[in-house]
Amino acid sequence: MKKNVPLIFGEVLFDIFENKNSVPGGAPFNVAWHLQGLGLQPFFVSRVGSDGNGNRIIQRMKDWGMSLRGVQRDDRHPTGTVSVTISNGEPEFDIHPEQAYDFIDFSRIKNLVENKSYPLLYHGTLAIRNEISRNTLKMIKQKTGAKVFLDINIREPWWSSELVTLQLAAANWVKCNADELKLIAEITGSSDENLYELAAKICKIFSLDFLIVTLGERGAFIIDKNEQLNKSRPRPVANLVDTVGAGDGFSAVSIFGILNNWQNQVILERAVEFAAKICGIRGATLNDHNYYDLILRRA
């Protein structure tokens, strides 16, 4: 196993906009896509239907040079879709049930994770709404022992307090937004008006290496296990299209930084910069390597 091959687990789907345009998405897919652009060749574990959308995903991954070893085909369930509406530049999601990514089968990837070493396992909270995919993730964690980057993506109604708490307890690094931080605080019985102090409490409760909190146009901050606080300044978006996938770009650069031993302040600044670039395109993925070169030139 190559030293810097992260394992990315979870949904791949199509974001369908009001004008009926559709673009590939899903936080784990977006993160894997960006990491491929950054040269890490991630091992992406997901599931698509045996349908036209599934074929489009497979072809898109091939064209980008991504590995297909962990992508399963499903004859019974469709490739995931999400209806996206944009209000004041912010996306709202209608996430459909019983999608292929809900049924990721561990037996299909068992030989790819047993006795294998991965430096990092990324996952979110949506793809584990269903017991089958949830159990597959559990087995991956057991078999690999990889350190976990948890991306909190609260999407109604596909979450529960128990689900979020269990994933936090197994995580090493966590990324969430300010609203999700407040929700975690409610779940854990924490309270504080100051976001920084609240994040420090959550970091301590779950023994995290660090917690990243994104603040939209106000930037982001990291608090680590030693209560060291780093803040980033916001980056202007010249031509805002939408914010779909901006957080996923942020996560990908954060993971790249972790695997390259960047200081927390460096992670923040570069992740915020890259997320701002995502806000200038429709959808969540880029086909232009120049965007990634901005990060790689300083790696």
Question: Where are the regions a protein language model picked out?
Answer:
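Glycine-rich phosphate/adenosyl-contacting loop at the front of the ribokinase-like
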Residues: 1-67, 240
